[in-house]
């Protein structure tokens, strides 16, 4: 059930409506395609917000994300902290162990009878894009963690991960790294 409090979360709302009943698994689409912060909040509320945050932090501990701390589910709080290294580890874990979540980020759109969610991902059309997520906060500026399949030789490829914080132009920075 989507709450008024979840909808009050800063940012776009993915077309969610107060009182709407929606499966938690469907909330991943506005969250990952459109950066719906209220989608993140609604997921956390479904499981009890504090319990959810505790689980996020315990998962970070389990994955040895030593410098990552979650203070809110959307990543908006300036008290959320992480490092490029930790973001990279987390993306690798999701790619290997929760591939269905990672795969959502490769879709251009997802539609239900009530919603049409469209990707705002700048890298979606980049050759070899395997998935990822970008974001923005005043503290971290433009951020991104993405995975690409890059040609290694005429017949082989290699997955390359890119994680950036504090970028002023993540699209340019990622392009430069991919060309390196």
What do the predicted segments below correspond to?
Residues 48-180:
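Penicillin-recognizing serine hydrolase domain
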């Amino acid at each position: 059930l989507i709450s008024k409090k979840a909808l009050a979360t800063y940012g776009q709302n993915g077309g969610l409506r107060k009182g709407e009943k929606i499966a938690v698994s469907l909330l991943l689409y506005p969250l990952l395609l459109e950066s719906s912060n209220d989608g993140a909040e609604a997921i956390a509320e479904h499981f009890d917000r504090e319990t959810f945050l505790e689980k996020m932090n315990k998962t970070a501990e389990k994955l040895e994300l030593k410098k990552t701390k979650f203070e809110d589910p959307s990543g908006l709080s300036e008290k959320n902290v992480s490092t490029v290294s930790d973001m990279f580890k987390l993306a690798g874990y999701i790619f290997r162990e929760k591939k269905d979540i990672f795969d959502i980020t490769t879709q251009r759109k997802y539609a239900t009878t009530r919603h049409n969610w469209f990707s705002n991902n700048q890298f979606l059309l980049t050759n070899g894009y395997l998935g990822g997520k970008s974001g923005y906060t005043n503290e971290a500026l433009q951020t991104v963690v993405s995975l690409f399949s890059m040609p290694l030789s005429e017949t082989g490829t290699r997955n390359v991960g890119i994680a950036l914080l504090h970028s002023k132009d993540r699209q340019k920075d990622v392009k430069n790294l991919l060309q390196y």
